């Protein structure tokens, strides 16, 4: 990939008020994107956002920039990221733009683009937008300026799309479900989808105020959901993150069910229904228990680099239809073009309803291995600790001790001078000791 100035692996992201997430930058980004995308045709762009207070400011800036370039904006209001991908496809819009920083705190925000088919913008288009950013803004003739309008039925359209991924012959009428929307973009979508499919729904994290997105709620912090599931004696809980592209579940005993377990359930059900084409894609962080459980079922498994973008790339390379990260990004290419928390959750609920099994029992075929993660800070510029002979020697010793019933993964953080030491195996005490032994070797360098 070329050395781009603004676009990262997941669009442009940062703290609001600091470059690049400022009104003037975002206005220019809208204009530059408009100039590039106007070369292609429909001249309309879908703009969605999550529930952050800064979304109002940033969507206005984007709209002004797009209008100056001669493109019209269609606003969805607060809407999950996968909903914007879906609406971009169905409206045949030139692109979709999501204003969100996903699972980050409210004071961060970001801009992410989808192309006309609901997939990520090609690198070449992002590079063309960056090149346009270097130019002075110029306005099209007044008669050519873009307009702005709202898609008044955006939520209803997406609710119907989600429901259509759940089999008609099944119902959720037997289930009591606690849903946690992270005070984010799914707050007016997910409870309605589940209720319309017959579930008894208790909703939490559905009162966004602009600053409480992801705050002690949602997929990145399921403690409130676990407590409520137990208090309500519910059958299960479902948590989404701030922009609705991740899902984490909780069984009736309050146990967390992560993206690895969710993918296992969906892949096994696909196999049972004769609908699984090929295998499943996880990441370097996917639990070894997932790999072994899929192997027992005869389902091929491949690991991609961490990041839903890389999972999708590996799925496309293999021609497979299902992929997931343990953080709850689940991509089902038979249903959607991108990670969709609501759609993934519905496939697990369908497996429960069809088999008359609890979430707890559906997970029982997969034994999760203890996975210990230790972060070790090192001095930036002091060389690569992973290349040091002493670290390599200790790592090799641990790998021999674990044999084929465990894994060691050492990787550098992409954002700060940290080495992430992950050790996985069947015995938690042994795995913990091994992880700290490697961490100590890294510290000693």
Curated annotation (Swiss-Prot):
The keyword Iron-sulfur does not apply. GO terms for molecular function: magnesium ion binding; phosphoglucosamine mutase activity; phosphomannomutase activity. Activated by phosphorylation. The active site is at residue 102. Keywords: Isomerase, Magnesium, Metal-binding, Phosphoprotein. Mg(2+) binds at residues 102, 241, 243, 245. GO terms for cellular component: cytosol. Its cofactor is Mg(2+). Its EC number is 5.4.2.10. Pfam families: PGM_PMM_I, PGM_PMM_II, PGM_PMM_III, PGM_PMM_IV. Catalyzes the conversion of glucosamine-6-phosphate to glucosamine-1-phosphate. HAMAP family: GlmM_B. This is Phosphoglucosamine mutase. It comes from Escherichia coli (strain 55989 / EAEC).
